[in-house]
A protein has these predicted regions:
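A short, structured active-site edge motif that brings together acidic residues
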Residues: 61-74, 103, 169-171
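Acidic (Asp/Glu)-rich catalytic clusters
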Residues: 29-30, 52-62, 87-96, 129-131, ...
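Short Fe-S-cluster ligation motifs
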Residues: 322-361, 387-393
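Short, acidic/polar
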Residues: 13-28, 77-94, 145-157, 231-236
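N-terminal binding-site loop/beta-alpha segment at the start of enzyme catalytic domains
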Residues: 1-63, 126-132
Length: 393
């Protein structure tokens, strides 16, 4: 999903660094990775094509490929538009069958959207027939949002209306008990699948990177137990430990991320009960830090006014984790925190792309899997920035 990018030749935006993608894919396959997840909407619509180019250089039987019937504008929700999207995936990825095909982000718009997007237009029936003839090997869905839709989709399975071969859920040691935004507790999501023996594909094991960029005292707590292991490895061991997990996804942009994950899973050492409880206690400590549940998926982009939404939210979360979001000018480290926040903000986000340019058009929020009220958060951050600049906290 998060393939590496480089500046576009015309200076407008970014483009996928295909050489870097090829290198990552080659190394991954050489070291046992065999499941590659993409979508028509990832990386501004270029992910499927880039993934296909990289994988075409390897024997088809050496990897499993997963992609999705994504939620673009409702204009694409017709049967004709959906089938066109489905067929274009084959063309872009240069394959004649797809190993794992998903209904993308069910629950994101509630029951009405689920029906319109996948049931009323006959797409579930179409995809079941595609599975019967072998163009799809396994059919499932990914979930974000309304738990009523999650339960209904599983009831369809129970009633024999459609057999789901797998389901993709968000699972990590924070969301197991402390899910926020639109995320339902991972414990419930996983248990409902396990009782039906439906394999679970795990997304967001790092909670959008937040479980690899934790506050210093959390780093110290984890390093105290396993000094040689990365902070991220704890989250990946947790995600891979449940019995009915099929595979764990990771958006690995850099080679060092890939190598660290390979070390964690070569072989995977499941967590003990004591280690699992240690992580739950760690999650309780992390809940004292009020971060915004942005996972840098960039579904909210591009902003029509040029705002770099993910960069703003990620900078804010980074400062929260580092203790650089002062509540008052009377705070002991106010001067240091004020400077760290403002200097880091200008370095992370160009001035013309900062939160003060938000008009509140709300084009972004409906696309957010975490159901963040993005204009509200941007206005809150902009107000905080102005208070820091004017020293009126």
């Amino acid at each position: 999903m998060r393939w590496p990018t480089v500046p576009a030749p015309d200076g407008k935006g970014e483009m996928i660094d295909q050489d870097a993608v090829n290198e990552l894919v080659d190394y991954a396959i050489a070291h046992g990775v065999n499941y590659f997840d993409t979508s028509p909407m990832y990386v501004q619509g270029w992910s499927e094509k880039s993934t296909g180019i990289a994988l075409k250089r390897h024997p088809r039987e050496s990897f499993y490929l997963a992609t999705k019937l994504s939620n673009f504008h409702p204009d694409t929700w017709t049967r004709e538009g959906s089938i066109a999207m489905y067929r274009k995936s084959f063309e872009d990825m240069q394959v004649d069958y797809i190993d794992y095909y998903l209904l993308h982000m069910i629950g994101g718009g509630g029951m009405e959207q689920f029906r319109k997007r996948y049931i009323d237009n006959g797409m579930i029936d179409f995809l079941v027939k595609e599975r019967e003839v072998g163009r799809i090997r396994r059919l499932g869905w990914s979930f974000h949002g309304d738990i009523e839709v999650y339960d209904y989709a599983l009831q369809m399975h129970d009633r024999g209306e459609v057999h789901w071969d797998f389901v993709q859920i968000q699972l990590n040691y924070v969301d197991w008990k402390h899910a926020s935004g639109s995320n339902f507790k991972a414990e419930y999501l996983y248990d409902e699948l396990a009782k039906r023996k439906i394999p679970a594909v795990i997304m967001e094991p790092l909670l959008g990177g937040r479980l690899s960029n934790v506050p210093d005292h959390i780093v110290a707590r984890l390093k105290q137990r396993e000094p040689e292991r990365s902070v991220a490895s704890w989250a990946f061991r947790y995600a891979g430990s449940p019995q009915d997990v099929l595979t764990v996804l990771s958006g690995m942009t850099y080679m060092e991320h890939l190598q660290d994950n390979i070390r964690t899973y070569s072989p995977l050492v499941p967590l003990t009960e004591e280690e699992t409880q240690y992580l739950y206690d760690t999650a309780d400590l992390m809940m004292e830090y009020p971060t915004i549940p942005c996972n840098d998926c960039k579904y909210c982009m591009p902003c029509p006014y040029g705002i770099d939404i993910p960069a703003i939210l990620i900078h804010y979360n980074k400062c929260v984790n580092e203790g650089n979001v002062p509540e008052s000018s009377q705070d002991e480290n106010y001067r240091k925190a004020r400077r760290a926040f403002l200097v880091g903000y200008d370095r992370s986000v160009p001035k013309l792309r900062q939160a003060d340019h938000c008009t509140g058009c709300n084009q972004c929020s409906p696309h957010c899997p975490q159901t963040i009220d993005i204009p509200k958060e941007l206005h809150r951050i902009d107000k905080f920035v102005e208070q820091l600049k004017q020293e009126t906290l």
